[in-house]
Amino acid sequence: MRTPVSTYRLQIRKGFTLFDAAKTVPYLHSLGVDWVYLSPVLTAEQGSDHGYDVTDPSAVDPERGGPEGLAAVSKAARAAGMGVLIDIVPNHVGVATPAQNPWWWSLLKEGRQSRYAEAFDVDWDLAGGRIRLPVLGSDDDLDQLEIRDGELRYYDHRFPLAEGTYAEGDAPRDVHARQHYELIGWRRADNELNYRRFFAVNTLAGVRVEIPAVFDEAHQEVVRWFREDLADGLRIDHPDGLADPEGYLKRLREVTGGAYLLIEKILEPGEQLPASFECEGTTGYDALADVDRVLVDPRGQEPLDRLDASLRGGEPADYQDMIRGTKRRITDGILHSEILRLARLVPGDANVSIDAGADALAEIIAAFPVYRTYLPEGAEVLKEACELAARRRPELDQAIQALQPLLLDTDLELARRFQQTSGMVMAKGVEDTAFFRYNRLGTLTEVGADPTEFAVEPDEFHARLARRQAELPLSMTTLSTHDTKRSEDTRARISVISEVAGDWEKALNRLRDLAPLPDGPLSALLWQAIAGAWPASRERLQYYALKAAREAGNSTNWTDPAPAFEEKLKAAVDAVFDNPAVQAEVEALVELLEPYGASNSLAAKLVQLTMPGVPDVYQGTEFWDRSLTDPDNRRPFSFDDRRAALEQLDAGDLPASFTDERTKLLVTSRALRLRRDRPELFTGYRPVLASGPAAGHLLAFDRGTAAAPGALTLATRLPYGLEQSGGWRDTAVELNTAMKDELTGAGFGPGAVKIADIFRSFPVALLVPQTGGES
């Protein structure tokens, strides 16, 4: 198996095709990248910016460059000695435009007789054997249907007609009644849908890749990539949606000839990948959470908790109660169709009614501490969730006791489907709701993180990295992705608030006075986001504010927006640009946070790039990138600027200040090059401790062994507190051999070396043992 040393994620779309990606390969190679990492490239919904709505898995998307474009990327990568990692989406396909998806079109036209009927997860027993499509403004809109060009039309929506169901002059409403599908009002999707989706997205229909024939057809193009040596590895999107993730990975490993595989699996604290999973690890959110938290000041927790409580009227937020509520909001709302389907699968001899079963199943899911179980290994997790659900709702105890053995029986469809459903609820209830409500420090509410873990001390951080080296050395590490709520540099700046909680509280109170918003917790989220991403355009901040408010769902929401509140929200954001006093407050806050945020950014980047695992660089983040949630994190950027800056660095033109964005490029390029060119320096993991008054502000580790020292990473943590306490002073680190800083070229040691000398230019350093000819 070929494995990567590092990757660089590129978002492939119509505006940046595979041919464009091929042209970036020389720059990526110069940057030090080992593998090119591509977003989904199979044919997707026309105009899709992300590619996760695949409509035809049999071909590379023509809009994205087609098979010729993929061949161009692969050829360029091979010429540079690089590999290719590609993102694939086995869980679902895009069905927004049925005519673009031949599988879905066939299903709608032929129903159960379609060759693709088994490919989709349809409950045919509901709705009289028809597929319910929630596309109408209301059920009354059936009168708006038309027959045109041999198709059923609803405004711009087109649907096929089954053979023999239409004769000239037939009323469209009557023709509709004869189809294998039923068009319904969009609001009915919450309770009456009968096909599995990706989360609550009606236009993404679940696919049953657990069926061998479906797997084969869905992966024929993917298999070609490996047969023709176009790709080296795969990133698997949303494996938790699959009926049998373990079986899927085993089959995928076989058909790709033993390729490198990563899964987009979010691990909760303490959770481990099942040993039976044939993959190299995750896409790195677990690493992101660890890196963020070691740069957060634990002393900020108490004052930020107090502030959060005051914003809630004096009562502190109980996170477990909160997520129980937000998950029930999802099970009883946008995913209730899925819960009802589970309830219909409960055997009659269990003596549990549909209503009681749905309530009990939802309560068990709300008690889940992880996204899903993988039975039989996860049996204890399921049992504990059942116990917690019964304690919370004693009146459901009998139903829960009846359900537990059924949910543990892997031969039952109920158990398999329950496992597919719990992850959806976790994602929507926690990531997409609670993370917009629990706002004491925005850094903590990131994908894959547990926001109740406020900070991680260095000794615990080192223990986690040592485990990573021992157990998952080929798992990905990351700081920014297309899914992160805030980019790495936005979070790094927000993290400084943990060191200046008092100043933050005063600034927030002034901003709330100047631009009132009747939702205290949301105001904290909003002003932290603005401070973290500043400078930003009015349009970006308005979009983020509205999305955050609707996701939180307290003062407004997506299905029933609150115009009065949203107008106040808009006014608060406008005030940043139109009210000099508000703008002055924001700029003063940013001025306070920025230098320490830049230090945090460099520390996080160097640590992530050199820690155990396979580091990924998300496109463009070798420069400062202060993005917010999608689609803000997919904005266009210039490779030309980065290429020119890298050439300047290589010519010896180093940044004069560590706040210069070229410093981040310097750190990124030197770390990536070293990992690629000197792999022998990254074979182990040993914590390195400093001595002296500021030892706690140094995070350092040696990637070698006791017998053979390797690359030595040194990074500043809690830089504001360091400055306030008088700086590094006599704090020193012991070097066993002479070493050179890859960032500056300066030499140090052997012996005790002051940290202030090592960090004379930048708040981070990457030291390597000097060879005999170096001085």
Curated annotation (Swiss-Prot):
Q: Which GO terms describe its biological process?
A: alpha-glucan catabolic process; trehalose biosynthetic process
Please report a single Pfam family linked to this protein. Answer: Alpha-amylase
Q: Which InterPro entries match?
A: Glyco_hydro_13_cat_dom (IPR006047), Glycoside_hydrolase_SF (IPR017853), Maltooligo_trehalose_synth_4 (IPR013797), Trehalose_TreY (IPR012767)
The Gene Ontology terms for molecular function here are: (1,4)-alpha-D-glucan 1-alpha-D-glucosylmutase activity
**UniProt keyword Isomerase, yes or no:** yes
SMART domains membership: Aamy
Which keywords annotate this record? Isomerase
Q: What class of enzyme is it?
A: isomerase
What Enzyme Commission number(s) apply to this enzyme? Answer: 5.4.99.15
Q: Would I find Isomerase among this entry's keywords?
A: yes
Q: Name the catalysed reactions.
A: 4-[(1->4)-alpha-D-glucosyl](n-1)-D-glucose = 1-[(1->4)-alpha-D-glucosyl](n-1)-alpha-D-glucose
Q: What does this protein do?
A: Catalyzes the conversion of maltooligosaccharide into the non-reducing saccharide, maltooligosyl trehalose (alpha-maltooligosyl alpha-D-glucoside) by intramolecular transglycosylation.
Q: How does it assemble?
A: Monomer.
Its family? Belongs to the glycosyl hydrolase 13 family.
Protein's name according to its UniProt entry: Maltooligosyl trehalose synthase
Organism equals Arthrobacter sp. (strain Q36)
**Name of the gene:** treY
